[in-house]
Design a protein with these regions (language model features):
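Glycine-centered secondary-structure boundary/capping sites
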Residues: 14, 38-43, 65-67
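A contiguous, low-structure linker/loop signature
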Residues: 57-102, 114-121
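A common structural microfeature
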Residues: 19-21, 43, 59
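Active-site loop segments of alpha/beta catalytic cores
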Residues: 1-28, 32, 63, 95-333
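Short aromatic-enriched loop/helix-cap "lid" or pocket-rim segments at secondary-structure transitions
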Residues: 33-36, 58-59, 74-76, 82, ...
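Segments that shape or occlude catalytic/ligand-binding pockets
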Residues: 29-56
Length: 333
């Protein structure tokens, strides 16, 4: 029987693992009593050394390590309200957190040792585009793409260099992959034109992916929204796994026909059309469909839960139904 780490690598590389790998989260959801990894299994381990650290400065506001001030909404993460890079003249003075410092990973080492059989993912929150608009402001960054192109590219390069240093730190810890986030789509299109994306972001992502591959690590990117216009580009520059919480706005059939067998998908059932409805029959059917259509390439699909189910109104029973369905149908076709 393969170890979890070997199962995941085989799924990503389309080498016919014995079952679909699952990530049913090592973190407990407030209000849920089920220990999902203990009950249903877990093939992954998140290493969180450079992830999202912050300090509350009021009851509803907190500041992250980059100097962004967030406003919370109930129990949700909230959004950035104060952006530290107000003027481009301040770019040279930008506060870069010391995320590659080995000291901040010391508390992760015992857990890494205990999870050598798992596929270990080093987490980097808000890797490139999201980091840029957190620092500059979303609307302002949109204008900057056309009015301050040189400064935008300088900022992108600073973030890429920083990200590569963090990647190397995770490599030294023995991680098998990098997991990062960058939401690129709204419901029906990209947030910027594909042409602009290819000019500014594509070469910088390639440097990031290449850095991971140089250290023998896979790269997993979370991105929500309609992103089919750039999936071919991501595949071309070496993205190994796309983690998407929505599929129905693009179409599972389309994803399978155009991209199946070329990139590995890492998904829960759709959080907008399926999991949110708490319809057990629909959840089971969609879990089966994801495996049958995206995982019919001797791999190419890995199952996961959604990390904030209560934020979308998903019940504990619905999450259990999804996990059980992924286990029930978790063989490649």
């Amino acid at each position: 029987m393969d170890r979890s780490v070997d199962l995941v690598k085989k799924a990503i590389e389309f080498r016919g693992p014995e079952r679909v790998p699952v990530s049913f989260t090592q973190f407990k959801t407030p209000g849920f009593t089920t220990d999902f990894p203990k009950v249903y299994g877990e093939d992954f381990h998140f290493v969180m050394g450079s992830a999202f650290n912050f300090n509350f400065i009021s009851e509803t506001q907190y500041i992250d390590e980059w100097g962004c001030i967030w406003e919370t909404f109930g129990d949700t993460m909230g959004e950035v309200k104060t952006h530290p890079l107000k003027e481009w003249e301040d770019l040279e003075k930008l506060k870069i957190p010391d995320l590659e410092n080995p000291a901040r990973y010391e508390n992760q080492k015992p857990m890494i040792e205990q999870n050598q059989d798992k596929f270990k993912m080093g987490a980097i929150a808000f890797v490139l585009f999201e980091r840029m608009h957190h620092l500059r402001g979303f609307q302002q960054l949109m204008e900057d793409f056309y009015l301050e192109r040189e400064n935008v590219e300088k900022l992108g390069d600073i973030i890429v260099e920083h990200t590569i240093r963090v990647i190397n730190t995770y490599a030294e810890l023995g991680c098998d992959a990098i997991f990062s986030t960058d939401d690129w789509g709204v419901q029906d299109r990209l947030l910027i034109s594909p042409k602009l994306w290819r000019e500014i972001f594509k070469p910088r992502y390639k440097k990031i992916f290449d850095a991971a591959h140089k250290r023998n690590m896979k790269y997993i990117l979370h991105s929500c929204g309609q992103i089919t216009d750039i999936l071919d580009d991501f595949i071309e520059i070496g993205l190994d796994v796309i983690q998407m919480d929505q599929q129905d706005n693009m179409g599972i059939d389309l994803l399978s026909e155009r991209f199946g067998g070329r990139i590995c998908f890492f998904c829960p059932t759709d959080i907008q059309t399926t999991l949110i409805n708490n319809d057990k029959e629909l959840i089971e059917a969609k879990a089966k469909e994801l495996i049958e259509k995206l995982g019919k390439f001797k791999g190419g699909f890995m199952a996961k839960t959604y990390p904030q189910p209560t934020d979308i109104g998903a019940t504990e029973e619905s999450v259990k139904t999804m996990c059980e369905a992924f286990i029930k149908y978790g063989r490649y076709f």
